[in-house]
Curated annotation (Swiss-Prot):
Transmembrane segments: none annotated. It is an enzyme of class 2 (transferase). PANTHER family: 12S RRNA N4-METHYLCYTIDINE METHYLTRANSFERASE, S-ADENOSYL-METHYLTRANSFERASE MRAW. S-adenosyl-L-methionine binds at G35, G36, H37, D55, F79, D96, Q103. One of its GO terms (molecular function) is rRNA (cytosine-N4-)-methyltransferase activity. This is Ribosomal RNA small subunit methyltransferase H. Specifically methylates the N4 position of cytidine in position 1402 (C1402) of 16S rRNA. It is found in: Cytoplasm. Keywords: Cytoplasm, Methyltransferase, rRNA processing, S-adenosyl-L-methionine, Transferase. It comes from the Bacteria. GO terms for biological process: rRNA base methylation. HAMAP family: 16SrRNA_methyltr_H (MF_01007).
Length: 305
């Protein structure tokens, strides 16, 4: 299907440069989205090069199917499944995390509090519970825990109680506008320039899609599929994601000693950290949604996974 929403790929040139492209190599775009990174990457591959992409979103799959290049293939799977590819087969893995502009701007997807739509938020609409279905039955304690942990919302308890009150008085929440209204009434202190529903919507989206758990699985899988010298490039958009990526790279970039066996040889590092990159002022001015992006880069060593 053809999107009518504008999508600008964040850190496009920087991400492809960070992959240090080998024209004959096999690359993995673990989060195809609308294909900005994939298309530029393909343009730098030789006839022998290959690109395998992953995405859970059916709209992304439809977009990917418009690419007829025989060097390209798309899998309708989340990126935690990239470990199914042959070991040490990839010269680079790229992950562009979070939700895309077309997903946010399409009211039918239910990701945004700025327009009314069904309260869904699933990346893959063919499976799993929608946010509306989950909120209909979740306890106050569970809702508060999710909103606090994944949204870092200090009014999580008040929001959860307000959702429960709304369920009791008027039935389950069905739309994004209904949820945004409930949250606005529960969050008493406003952050400058930020809608009061921002943290709750982020929390529910992350939870319903198991985003952080799947990110951890995908990072672990990248160690298996990357060949020595292969690059891992990850773009994140909020502190919860970036913390996981940062800690993973740091943990794999140092020798680890087993305290239970002090005379044993340390586990050698499996990644070499190559730093982080933020969008330029010019990119932020052209695309304000890029402001929070952080790209971290690491290189696979020859130590087995």
């Amino acid at each position: 299907m053809q999107d009518t929403w504008t999508h600008r790929t964040v850190l496009l040139n920087e991400a492809i440069a960070a992959l240090h492209i080998n024209p004959d190599g096999h690359y993995i775009d673990a989060t195809f989205g609308r294909g900005g990174h994939s298309r530029l990457l393909l343009s730098q591959l030789s006839p022998q090069g290959r690109l395998t992409a992953f995405d859970k979103d059916l709209d992304a799959i439809a977009e990917a199917q418009t690419i007829t290049d025989p060097r390209f293939s798309i899998r309708h799977e989340g990126f935690m499944h990239l470990g199914q590819l042959p070991a040490a087969s990839a010269a680079g893995v790229l992950m562009d995390l979070g939700v895309s502009s077309p997903q946010i701007d399409n009211p039918v997807r239910g990701f945004s509090f700025r327009s009314e739509g069904p309260l869904d938020m699933r990346m893959d609409t063919t499976r799993g519970q929608s946010v509306a279905e989950w909120l209909a039955d979740a306890s106050i304690e569970t809702m508060a825990e999710v909103i606090r942990e994944y949204g870092e919302e200090r009014f999580a308890q008040q929001v959860a109680k307000a959702i429960d009150r709304r369920r009791q008085e008027r039935g389950p929440l069905r739309t994004t506008a209904e949820l945004a209204e409930v949250v606005a009434g529960a969050v008493k202190t406003r952050e400058p320039g930020k809608d009061p529903a921002t943290r709750t919507f982020q929390a529910l989206r992350i939870f319903i899609n198991a985003e952080l758990e799947e990110l951890q699985q995908a990072l672990e899988a990248s160690l298996k599929v990357l060949q020595p010298g292969g690059r891992l490039v990850v773009i994140s958009f909020h502190s919860l994601e970036d913390r996981i990526v940062k800690q993973f790279i740091a943990g794999q970039s140092r020798e680890v000693f087993d305290r239970r066996a002090p005379f044993a040889a340390p586990k050698a590092m499996r990644l070499k950290a190559l730093g982080r990159i933020k969008p330029s002022e010019e990119e932020i001015a052209a695309n304000p949604r890029s402001r929070s992006a952080v790209m971290r880069v690491a290189e696979r060593t020859g130590v087995s996974a």
